[in-house]
């Protein structure tokens, strides 16, 4: 049985070097614009949180689904790390996509993203209702209610770190509302309940 309206998000988080660079960038923009600070991530999937989740059991089942290099079929069937190209900066009127790095997954990489969601759905089961997000892959750099001109100006004024032309995502993270909250509408209500290193891919 699920609790209607209690969401869960599944993130792909960058490897340590890119994570550090993106975290500094996010922190700088948050200080400049008064927005929240958050962990750099790409949203892989959204779920509905079942009642009385046994987190250690969920983590163990997901860990068992991590692809093992060299095992037949592992690259197609298991959870694995993924490297994506970025194609510049983007902006959107949505609070959580106000300013972001746009990703450019190839057809094969899109298939890999879809396969990762399928693995999650298969491991978690139907009660979680795991599904891909309705928005394009991206890594947010700032959240906020920005005017269009402000967003455009930020894109014009922001140099892109060449080290972020390609980003490897090597960790799966589960996020749910903290105790007492029922939505993920506020960053302050986010609680990371699971962090799982993925295969080398």
At which residue positions do the language-model features occur?
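Short, basic/glycine-rich phosphate-binding loops at helix/coil junctions
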Residues: 90-102
């Amino acid at each position: 049985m699920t609790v209607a309206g209690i969401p869960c998000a599944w993130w792909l988080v960058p490897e340590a070097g890119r994570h550090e660079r993106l975290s500094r960038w996010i922190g700088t923009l948050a200080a400049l614009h008064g927005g929240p600070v958050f962990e750099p991530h790409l949203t892989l999937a959204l779920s509905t949180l079942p009642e009385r989740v046994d987190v250690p059991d969920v983590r163990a089942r997901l860990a068992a689904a991590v692809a093992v290099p060299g095992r037949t079929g592992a690259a197609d069937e298991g959870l694995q790390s993924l490297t994506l190209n970025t194609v510049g900066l983007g902006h959107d009127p949505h609070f959580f996509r106000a300013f972001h790095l746009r990703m450019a997954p190839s057809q094969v990489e899109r298939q890999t993203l879809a396969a990762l969601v399928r693995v999650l759905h298969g491991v978690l089961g139907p009660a979680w209702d795991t599904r891909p997000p309705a928005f394009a892959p991206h890594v947010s750099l700032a959240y906020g209610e920005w005017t269009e001109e402000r967003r455009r100006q930020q894109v014009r004024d922001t140099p892109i770190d060449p080290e972020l032309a390609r980003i490897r995502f090597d960790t799966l993270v589960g996020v749910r509302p903290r105790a007492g909250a029922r939505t993920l509408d506020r960053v302050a209500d986010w609680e990371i309940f699971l962090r799982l290193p993925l295969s080398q891919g």
